[in-house]
């Protein structure tokens, strides 16, 4: 045996000292090693093993010995060289194995030579670590690498596995030394199942390793997994079924296997399906995916309250109330901001979808029938239950959220109008939450409740005012600039709805669609504005839109009108200011201040004893009036055409001096042109009550007495009565007031002093703004609008409020587009 030969040589030649426990005189100095390097003296063997780690020295019956045996089998696999150790080779593969083994031995196999360097050698370097090997030290040389290449004994390892080459056996390949296993794998793939070299033409490659085709199978059931799904566990392939049955985890929530196809959540040795159902709070079942959780007693919770077993949904009554309020506010916010629309679009959607005569559900037919019915139903006080109580009750009860419609998707405002109303003759009013607003009412209103309850006549006017109040309340919350700041059809449409309160179906004879009128209104904004007295008038027009007073933003006005009928009808809705202000500012033209009748017999208020000097108050623009001027469409223009209304005229002593018409002739006279009459200011509403066309000279001296009016209505036909009524501005609203009011002489004198015979010198404020170079009666080549004759003048006792006027937009009708931009010059003033 080679080992015995080495031992004999070492004993006889060197007689080196042994580290074993055997007797030194036994002559068995090398017997303590299971293997020693060949060709070395005992002192050289000792020097060599001294360079190795203690656990790798092959002492007999030591760990080093076991390590050596293991490395022999691993680094030098017997099935890489001998056919008899192979299990599944065919004849062709056996022959190929023999050829492969012989070629490796011939070309790469070798054993390292241990030599002690001469002291003269000064520049030897280790190939592994690159450090210097000094003279007199042990070094290992490899014949296949060349004479000058050497390694330290501890550096003589496989280049692949970095393990000491067992028994100094190496395979040299491409300048590197390898063990037999890894050298063979450089040439041929090795099967991970049988550990044999694969000589077949085909193999399976998975997980960075190779298998024989039939060797890549489930480790449990040996099912071939080539082309199939598999799971690697501890370096071994398993089919899905075997893996789930042997290694799959159980879900802590549902108790089922967590399959290979399911993601799982793991915490502290527990496993859950990675689903919202399984990985959820054990108390409230809220999903905890991606959320922090609180583990407690093998269960997970979303909060400390749930871990204590509390019901997070339980709450006291106050908390429920807050939650309910938040829910309502949330729903309101969703309604107001749906479809990502801007605030203006939301306001427009509320403005532009009212139902047809939604304030008058009973108003139908032509204008004559409607107005006649309205005047017949009008009473002294606000009526009780009306014929449309059910309608208002239904409106109060229903709350329908505004549906998402196609027109709301368009950014262009006119496109929205055409899409929503282009082919509809009816409007639809979305109901809105009723929100109570502050009632700005005069004190004596509350005392008239008994009289109102007793009067059971079904007054359409009463329902109209109820609808005004309802409209004001339901539109609350849009902001005080909802209409005043928008110069487009929104403001126009809003004022048109106000006029529908008074005129209802007076527009029925003109079938032009409303959106065309709105388009005309938009065109007005593109025209230049005149810089004259209209500046102050325009500021008042803005006041009408935004609801701000000329005298201040929020200045409260004293209630001067105490007439029971109109006091209650108007203050209920007019003095109740909403956030929008459009309705209320328009209705203030017939508010308690402007409806203080000079001829009231019910309230015997006397004018102030001393005569205050007449002067025009300076107009001050408020904050809300600094916005761009709002133009109104033809919807708000009053031209004085009204339906047939029964009217009683006051006596001559109660009427101001003015020109009147021959109403019978006027009804047959064609309208060559109709001048525009818009809400330029509140004074315009009060003073611009004259007729539209100039009367002839013979008509100027003709006056009607109260008896003439009565005879006219009793003797004339319905058509003539209608023609007569077409110039009546205020009787349509206050028909029953004629016989109940009287005119104090002092106030009448003061009023007649303001309205003199010379219509061109009404007021210094207006006349001073007129150009002296202009032709009399014309301005900029256009006729100056003439005041319309009044039947009553309503103003306060001291004439101190700029709002002492009735709305001039009642029962208004359209004018031609060419007259829309003509400014109102010098014939209007403010009563201060």
From Swiss-Prot:
Residues 14-122 form the PET domain. The modification Cysteine methyl ester is found at residue 829. It comes from Xenopus laevis. One of its GO terms (biological process) is anterior/posterior axis specification. Interacts with dvl2/dsh and mapk8/jnk1. Residues 669-680, 816-832 have a biased composition (Basic residues). This is Prickle-like protein 1-B. Residues 830-832 form a propeptide. Pfam families: LIM, PET.
């Amino acid at each position: 045996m080679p080992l015995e030969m080495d031992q004999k040589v070492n004993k006889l030649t060197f007689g080196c000292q042994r580290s074993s426990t055997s007797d030194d005189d036994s002559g068995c100095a090398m017997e303590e090693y299971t293997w020693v390097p060949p060709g070395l003296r005992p002192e050289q063997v000792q020097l060599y093993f001294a360079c190795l780690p203690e656990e790798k020295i092959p002492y007999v019956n030591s760990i080093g010995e076991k390590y050596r045996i293991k490395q022999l089998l691993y680094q030098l696999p017997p099935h890489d060289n001998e056919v008899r150790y192979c299990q599944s080779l065919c004849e062709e593969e056996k022959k190929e194995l023999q050829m492969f083994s012989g070629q490796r031995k011939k070309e790469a196999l070798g054993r390292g030579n241990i030599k002690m360097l001469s002291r003269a050698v000064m520049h030897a370097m280790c190939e592994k670590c690159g450090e210097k090997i000094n003279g007199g030290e042990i070094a290992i040389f490899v014949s296949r690498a060349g004479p000058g290449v050497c390694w330290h004994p501890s550096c003589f390892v496989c280049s692949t596995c970095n393990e000491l080459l067992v028994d100094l056996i190496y395979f040299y390949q491409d300048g590197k030394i390898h063990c037999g296993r890894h050298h063979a794998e450089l040439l041929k793939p090795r099967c991970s199942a049988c550990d044999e070299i694969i000589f077949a033409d085909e193999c399976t490659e998975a997980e960075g390793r190779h298998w024989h085709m039939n060797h890549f199978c489930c480790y449990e059931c040996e099912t071939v997994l080539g082309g199939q799904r598999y799971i690697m566990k501890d370096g071994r392939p398993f089919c899905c079924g075997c893996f789930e049955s042997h290694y799959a985890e159980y879900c802590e929530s549902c108790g089922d296997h967590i399959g290979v196809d399911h993601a799982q959540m793991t915490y502290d040795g527990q496993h859950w399906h990675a689903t919202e159902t399984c990985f959820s709070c054990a108390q409230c079942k809220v999903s905890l995916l991606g959320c922090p959780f609180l583990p407690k007693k093998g269960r997970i919770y979303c909060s400390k309250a749930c871990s204590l077993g509390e019901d997070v949904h339980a709450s006291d009554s106050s908390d429920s109330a807050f939650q309910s309020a938040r829910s309502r506010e949330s729903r309101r916010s969703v309604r107001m901001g749906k479809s990502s629309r801007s605030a203006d679009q939301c306001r427009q959607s509320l403005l532009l979808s009212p139902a047809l005569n939604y304030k008058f559900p009973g108003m139908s037919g032509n204008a004559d029938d409607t107005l006649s019915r309205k005047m017949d139903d009008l009473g002294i006080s606000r009526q009780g239950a009306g014929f449309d109580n059910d309608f208002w009750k239904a409106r109060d009860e229903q709350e329908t959220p505004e549906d998402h419609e196609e027109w709301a998707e368009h950014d262009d405002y006119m496109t929205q109008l055409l899409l929503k109303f282009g082919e509809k003759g009816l409007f639809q009013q979305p109901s809105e939450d009723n929100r109570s607003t502050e009632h700005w009412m005069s004190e004596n209103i509350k005392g008239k409740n008994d009289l109102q309850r007793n009067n059971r006549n079904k007054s359409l006017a009463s329902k109209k005012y109820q609808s005004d109040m309802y409209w004001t309340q339901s539109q609350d919350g849009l902001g005080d600039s909802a209409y005043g700041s928008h110069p487009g059809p929104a403001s126009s449409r809003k004022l048109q709805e106000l006029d529908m309160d008074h005129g209802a179906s007076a527009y029925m004879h003109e079938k032009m669609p409303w959106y065309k009128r709105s388009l005309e209104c938009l065109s007005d904004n593109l025209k230049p504005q005149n810089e004259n007295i209209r500046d102050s008038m325009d500021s008042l027009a803005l006041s009408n839109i935004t609801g701000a007073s000329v005298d201040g933003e929020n200045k409260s006005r004293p209630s001067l009108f105490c007439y029971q009928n109109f006091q209650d009808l108007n203050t209920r809705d007019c003095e109740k200011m909403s956030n929008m202000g459009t309705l209320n500012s328009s209705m203030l033209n017939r508010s308690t201040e402007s409806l203080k009748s000079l001829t009231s017999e019910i309230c015997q208020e006397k004018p102030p004893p001393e005569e205050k000097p007449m002067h025009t108050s300076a107009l001050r623009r408020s904050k809300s009036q600094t916005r761009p001027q709002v133009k109104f469409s033809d919807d708000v223009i009053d031209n004085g055409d009204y339906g047939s209304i029964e009217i009683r005229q006051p006596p001559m002593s109660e009427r101001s001096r003015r020109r009147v018409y021959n109403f019978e002739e006027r009804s047959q006279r064609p309208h060559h042109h109709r001048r525009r009459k818009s809400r330029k200011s509140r004074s315009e509403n009060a003073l611009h009550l004259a007729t539209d066309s100039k009367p002839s000279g013979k008509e100027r001296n003709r006056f009607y007495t109260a008896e003439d009016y009565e005879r006219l209505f009793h003797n004339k036909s319905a058509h003539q009565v209608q023609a007569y009524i077409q110039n009546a501005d205020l009787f349509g609203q206050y028909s029953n007031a004629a016989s109940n009011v009287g005119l104090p002489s002092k106030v009448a004198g003061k009023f007649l002093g303001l309205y003199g015979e010379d219509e061109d010198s009404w007021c210094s404020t207006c006349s001073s703004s007129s150009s002296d170079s202009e032709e009399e009666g014309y301005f900029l080549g256009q006729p100056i609008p003439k005041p319309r004759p009044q039947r009553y003048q309503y103003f306060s006792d001291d004439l101190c409020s700029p709002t002492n006027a009735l709305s001039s937009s009642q029962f208004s009708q359209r004018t031609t587009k060419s007259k829309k931009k003509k400014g109102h010059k010098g014939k209007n003033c403010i009563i201060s």
